[in-house]
Amino acid sequence: MAKDVITRALLRPIYKIYEKILWSQIKDGPFPFHVGIIPDGNRRWARNNRLPLDQGYYTGYVKLRDVLTWILEIGISTVTVFALSAENCEKRTQQELSMIFKYLKIGLDELLTSDLVHKYQVRVKAIGMLDKLPEDLKKLVVDLESTTEKYNKKKLILAICYGGRQEILDAIRKIMNDYKLGIIDSKSIDESTFRKYLYDQELSDIDLLIRSSGEIRISNFLLWHLAYSELFFVDVYWPDFRKIDLWRAIRSFQKRKRNFGA
C-alpha cells in the first residue's frame, strides 16, 4: 500500500500535464447534455487497499462530490447518478445498507446547503423505489427536492433503490390504469406518451454513460433513456476515478458519430 502511495505521488505531476492536454482537446465541445454515471467499485477498492468497507463507501462519496463539481464547472446540464440499485437495496446485508444510507444522508444533507447547488441553480430529484428508504432519508429527499424545485439551469438525478425494468413495469401499470379509466386510448400510446409515465417525464435521454471499475454492462440502469447513448467504461475503481478519466470519456464522446439507430 505504501508503494502505491509513493507511485501515485510520483505520477501526479504527469497526470496534471496530461489533464491539461486533454482539456485543450475537448474544451471547445460539443459536450454531452445528459451524463449518466455508474460509480462502481467502492467495495473492491476497499478490499484491494486492505481498508474497512466503510472507508470504501466514504471515499466513493467524496469522489462523487468531486466529479459532480467537475461536471457542473464545464457546463453539462444534466447528471444522473446510479446511487443504489433496486437489487442491492434488497440483497445487501443490513449492515452494508446502513453504511450506504449513512453516506447518502451525509450527501443529501450537503446538497441542501451546497454553494455549488445554488451557484449553478441545480434542481435535485430522486427516482426509484423510495419507499424502501429509512424515514429520515425519505424526509431529506422531500426537503431537497422542494428546496431546489425553483431551479431550472441544471439537473441532478439520484437513482436510489432504482431498477430500469421496474420503472418500465410501473409505467405500464399506470398506463393500463388510465386506459381502464378512459383517460387514454390505445391509439394515443406512443413514445412521447410512454415517457410521461416514467419516474421523471422531463428527463432527457442519456448522451454519455460512464461506468467505473472495468465492468462492461449497464446493470438495469435507465433502460429507456439509454437506447441511443454512447458508453464509456473506465478500468479504475470509483474512488480512484480522476479528472483525466472524465476528460477521456468526453473526448471519446466527441469523436463518435451519433446516428441514433439509423
UniProtKB/Swiss-Prot annotation:
Cofactor(s) needed for function: Mg(2+)
Annotated active site: D40, N88 (proton acceptor)
Biological process, per Gene Ontology: polyprenol biosynthetic process
PROSITE patterns per UniProt: UPP_SYNTHASE
GO molecular function, one term: ditrans,polycis-polyprenyl diphosphate synthase [(2E,6E)-farnesyl diphosphate specific] activity
Binding residue positions for substrate: G41, N42, R43, R44, W45, S85, A86, E87, R92, R211, R217, I218, S219
Keyword Ribonucleoprotein: no
E.C. no: 2.5.1.89
Binding site for Mg(2+): D40, E230
Alphabetic keyword roster: Magnesium, Metal-binding, Transferase
Gene3D superfamilies: Decaprenyl diphosphate synthase-like
HAMAP family to which the protein is assigned, alphabetical: ISPT
Family per record: Belongs to the UPP synthase family.
Protein function: Generates tritrans,heptacis-undecaprenyl diphosphate from isopentenyl pyrophosphate (IPP) and geranylgeranyl diphosphate. It is probably the precursor of glycosyl carrier lipids.
Subunit structure: Homodimer.
Stated name of the protein: Tritrans,polycis-undecaprenyl-diphosphate synthase (GGDP specific)
